[in-house]
Regions:
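Vicinal oxygen chelate
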Residues: 5-58
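PEST-like low-complexity, intrinsically disordered acidic/proline/serine-rich tracts
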Residues: 53, 58-366
Length: 366
C-alpha cells in the first residue's frame, strides 16, 4: 500500500488497484498501471509467484437451455472478428502419444504438468514469475485435449507413400553433403529462420509465444493475421477464378465460403518452399473456423497430399477471444541478429583463404 501511494503521488495511474488475485500462488499483490502506447504494465509485490488458472468449466461451456447464437456482421455473415489467442492450446501435441492411446481427456493436473514441461523447456532459465506475467498463460487454463489429430482415429499421421519414402531416404543420404557444404547465400537458411513464413498449416499452430490471431472481415473477404512473423492471409468468400497454374505462393491460393456458421477455406497453389511435416507444393489444405461461444473459436484443418501420405489427416484445437488485453505489436525478428552475417562472412573468408593458398601453391610450382 505504501509503495502504491508513492506511485500515485508521482502521477502513476492504476488501471487496477493492487490486490491478491484469485488463484494467486502467494499472498503477494499485483496491480496494473497505464503505460505509453496503450500498454498495460503489471506491478507485482516481492514474493509474487503467479496465478493458477481456473480449471472449472468455461462460461461458454456451461450447459444452457438456449443454444449459442453466432453474432452477425452488418452485411449478414457470421462475425468471427476479434483478437484471438492460441495460448490455451500451447502444449497440445500434434500426434497422440503412445502412452495415451486410450485416454479421452487429460486430468487438470496432467494438463498443467504438460504445459509446465513444455514452457520451461522452451524458455530456459527465465524466472517463473516473469514467464507467468509476460507470456499470458495465467489468463487461460491449459487445454485437456490429448492431441490435435482427430482423424485417423488413432491420432497419428498416416504412413508415407513409397515415393515420399524414397525422397526421405535420398534426403538422409545427402544431408552430410549439405552439412559439409559451405554456405553460399541466405537461402541456405530456411524460410522460417529468415522470418519469411512458417507456411501452412504451421502458421496457425500455437507456440510458446506470439500466439495472437487477429481476424477482420469486410463484405466478400476475411483477413487472418498471425502474430508470429505477422503473416496475413486475405481470403475471398465470394467465388472467383483461381490463380493460374503457374502462379505459386508462400501461403497458397485460398478460396473461402460460408457453410452455415462455419468459415471454410480451401487452399492450393503452394510454392513448395515451406512444408509442414513433409508436405509438398501439391498439398490441399481445408480449414474450418467455427465460433462455439462468445470466447471460443474452433479451428479444424484437413491436410491432403497424395504425393506424401497414403491418406488425408485432420487436426483440431481452439482459440480464445482476448480483446481486452491482447494486442499485435510490431514484429521484430532479426534486428541485431548477427548469425547470418557471421555464417556468410565466415564462408567467404574461407573462400579467400583457399584462393590465396592455391595461388601461393601455383606460384611456388612455377
Amino acid at each position: 500500500e505504501t509503495a502504491a501511494v508513492g506511485l500515485r503521488d508521482r502521477g502513476v495511474h492504476f488501471t487496477r488497484d493492487p490486490e491478491r488475485p484469485e488463484g494467486g500462488r502467494s499472498e503477494a499483490k499485483r496491480g496494473f498501471v497505464a503505460a505509453p502506447d496503450n500498454v498495460r504494465v503489471a506491478v507485482i509485490e516481492s514474493g509474487w509467484r503467479g496465478v493458477d488458472a481456473d480449471f472449472g468449466s468455461d462460461a461458454d461451456q456451461v450447459a444452457s437451455a438456449e443454444p449459442y447464437v453466432v453474432p452477425r456482421t452488418p452485411w449478414g455473415t457470421p462475425d468471427l472478428q476479434g483478437m484471438w489467442s492460441g495460448n490455451k492450446a500451447h502444449g497440445i501435441p500434434l500426434e497422440r502419444p503412445d502412452d495415451l492411446a486410450d485416454v479421452a481427456e487429460l486430468t487438470p493436473e496432467e494438463a498443467a504438468a504438460r504445459r509446465e514441461r513444455g514452457t520451461l523447456g522452451s524458455i530456459w532459465g527465465y524466472e517463473r514469475e516473469w514467464r507467468d506475467t509476460t507470456l499470458g498463460y495465467v489468463k487461460s487454463a491449459p487445454s485437456r485435449q490429448v492431441a490435435m489429430i482427430i482423424d485417423p482415429p488413432d491420432g497419428r499421421i498416416p504412413p508415407l507413400t513409397e515415393e515420399a519414402q524414397e525422397r526421405q531416404r535420398n534426403a538422409r543420404q545427402s544431408f552430410g553433403d549439405y552439412v559439409r557444404r559451405r554456405p553460399a547465400g541466405p537461402e541456405d537458411l530456411s524460410a522460417y529462420v529468415r522470418c519469411i513464413s512458417r507456411g501452412l498449416p504451421g502458421m496457425m499452430m500455437p507456440s510458446i509465444y506470439n500466439n495472437g490471431l487477429q481476424i477482420s472481415q469486410s463484405p466478400g473477404f476475411v483477413a487472418i493475421q498471425k502474430e508470429m512473423i505477422h503473416e496475413t492471409r486475405v481470403v475471398p468468400t465470394a467465388e472467383r477464378e483461381p490463380l493460374g497454374a503457374g502462379i505459386k505462393q508462400w501461403l497458397g491460393d485460398p478460396q473461402g465460403r460460408w457453410e452455415g456458421d462455419t468459415l471454410v477455406v480451401e487452399t492450393t497453389g503452394f510454392n513448395g518452399r515451406t512444408n509442414y511435416r513433409g508436405s509438398s507444393e501439391n498439398m490441399k489444405l481445408t480449414e474450418r473456423y467455427t465460433r462455439l461461444g462468445p470466447n471460443r473459436l474452433e479451428y479444424e484443418f484437413k491436410v491432403e497430399d497424395p504425393t506424401v501420405w497414403t491418406s488425408s489427416w485432420t487436426g483440431r484445437f481452439e482459440f480464445e477471444l482476448d480483446n481486452e488485453q491482447y494486442e499485435l505489436v510490431e514484429y521484430a525478428c532479426h534486428e541485431g541478429n548477427y548469425g547470418m552475417t557471421n555464417i556468410l562472412s565466415g564462408a567467404r573468408a574461407r573462400d579467400r583463404e583457399e584462393a590465396a593458398a592455391a595461388a601461393e601453391t601455383g606460384s611456388g610450382a612455377q
